[in-house]
């Protein structure tokens, strides 16, 4: 019963559409009407500016981290936390607050894995930053980090649930970037201005 309650709590926290709500509250705009029309942190940064974009990023990361942190205080087993991590990421991507649509799951995945495997996640974050900085493609950085996640997890952790989550999220995030991949291959992907 307690685990079910945490699934519900995690979903509603993860489903908070940070970019949409912050955009409407502070700028009177819906970020889904501009740029890539995505509600995630990258498009929010482009549409709303650096300060609000960073705020969206932080909120999206916390949506993955906070539910797991709270649940861990109630003696849930590690595998339950892994499942809650998946719920948080799916909630962000399929938010009940915006017609079951949402971002691509990268920032919320960062929050989830920062809690579950902080050292590996920080290494992947460093790789993400380097790829994004030198190529100016956030999408390529996201795809690279997602691809490396299950590889790093396999060699550093023996938990089957965690490895399964890393594979699912890697495939999911890369799939969510399918239009970005097409634009990268055609040379039409938008570069990110830092």
Curated annotation (Swiss-Prot):
Membrane-spanning parts: 2-22, 52-72, 80-100, 112-132, 137-157, 161-181
Enzyme Commission numbers on file: 2.3.1.275
Topology term for the membrane: Multi-pass membrane protein
Record localization: Cell inner membrane
InterPro entries cross-referenced by the UniProt entry: G3P_acylTferase_PlsY (IPR003811)
Main location: membrane
Domain of life according to the entry: Bacteria
Reactions it catalyzes: an acyl phosphate + sn-glycerol 3-phosphate = a 1-acyl-sn-glycero-3-phosphate + phosphate
Molecular functions per Gene Ontology: acyl-phosphate glycerol-3-phosphate acyltransferase activity
PANTHER family linked: GLYCEROL-3-PHOSPHATE ACYLTRANSFERASE-RELATED (PTHR30309:SF0), INNER MEMBRANE PROTEIN YGIH (PTHR30309)
Assembly and binders: Probably interacts with PlsX.
Task of the protein: Catalyzes the transfer of an acyl group from acyl-phosphate (acyl-PO(4)) to glycerol-3-phosphate (G3P) to form lysophosphatidic acid (LPA). This enzyme utilizes acyl-phosphate as fatty acyl donor, but not acyl-CoA or acyl-ACP.
Record protein name field: Glycerol-3-phosphate acyltransferase
GN (gene name): plsY
């Amino acid at each position: 019963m307690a685990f079910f309650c945490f699934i519900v709590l995690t979903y509603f926290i993860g489903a908070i559409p940070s970019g949409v709500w912050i955009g409407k509250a502070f700028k009177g705009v819906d970020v889904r009407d501009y740029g890539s029309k995505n509600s995630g942190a990258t498009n929010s940064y482009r549409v709303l500016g650096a300060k609000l974009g960073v705020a969206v990023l932080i909120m999206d990361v916390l949506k993955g981290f906070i539910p797991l942190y709270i649940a861990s205080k109630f003696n849930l087993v590690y595998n339950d936390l892994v499942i809650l991590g998946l719920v948080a990421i799916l909630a962000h991507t399929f938010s009940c607050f915006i017609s079951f649509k949402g971002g691509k799951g990268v920032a919320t995945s960062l929050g989830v894995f920062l809690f579950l495997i902080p050292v590996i996640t920080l290494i992947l974050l460093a790789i993400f930053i380097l790829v994004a900085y030198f190529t100016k493609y956030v999408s390529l950085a996201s795809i690279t980090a997602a691809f490396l996640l299950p590889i790093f997890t396999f060699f550093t952790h023996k938990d089957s649930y965690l490895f399964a989550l890393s594979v699912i999220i890697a495939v999911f995030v890369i799939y969510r970037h399918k239009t970005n991949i097409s634009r990268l291959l055609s040379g039409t992907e938008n570069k990110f201005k830092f």
